Amino acid sequence: WVDEVCGLEGDHQSRLALSRGVHLVFDHADLPVRNTVVMRTHDSRRIFAVPLGQYTYIGTTDDYHPECEYWPPVTEQDVDYLLSSTRRVMPEANLTADRIVSVWSGIRPLVGDGSGRASKELSRKEEVWTSPSGLLSVGGGKLSAYRAMAERVVEATYYRSLVADRNRLAGSRRASGLCR
């Protein structure tokens, strides 16, 4: 929603390149891996089979998605891609779509570079920027790095509001590399 909110200020150049990621869920008995398995797909991407309790999760896809939807669809092509990629590496699993217990998908708000490169080629690093009116925004990043992203936003807010006081924010690990 970063581009939508920033667009409320008027002239705003989109910074995001949206990517849809899909996961499939199987009963662990259908894909009884003991540890996370990294698989290379036919198009040189990487997907994972992750065991957790009675389930094994397979994912994720990484495809351009033109708009930000709260519940992005899981397409038949997504399912076929993940199933065929997994069967290529683990043919003994014999996974089929009728064995899927659940699916989910989400949107990655990657920071685009204007080059038109595929989403799989874009950096997952977050960026923090400030609009002319002072709106602080963050885009990109990974869910697993949410604490580091939050720290950058808090530090940027803190330093911007206390220009004269250069004390570090309590608990902060960094003093440099801030968004100003």
Per-segment meaning from a language model:
Residues 2-57, 63-180:
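C-terminal catalytic lobe of FAD-dependent flavoproteins
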